[in-house]
């Protein structure tokens, strides 16, 4: 590899990783702001029902769907931090070669998990406020995690893209 190509590769890696970090930070801020705003807005009772989704304040001591609510908070926090560290390491390594939607997906997963960890570290619970009536109440960071995971799965299922031009074959003899 030439020195010029190597510099281009390093720049591409830097840009991809910067995109990951910036999008993650922005989504964390949005998720935290939504949780902070939900508490005073919904403390007096349920908010508007928009049909498919409504607003109801729930403080979740557990993890997904309230599971693990009886586990010690410190244990949930340590396991969550370990998972975030693993995903962040995977993202840092793979993002330079990943398509944009996988980068966005990894940022969503990291942001959602980090936001919920920050929220839990404040008072031992996660603030949930989105309610469907047929699904446990959840929050915007949960949406980031779900959509992000779906984007990552799409990237895994996507056929690999070759960097070489397609091979042309001669027409068959008739």
Whereabouts are the PLM-identified features?
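Alpha-helical transmembrane bundles and membrane-interface segments of multipass inner-membrane proteins
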Residues: 1-174
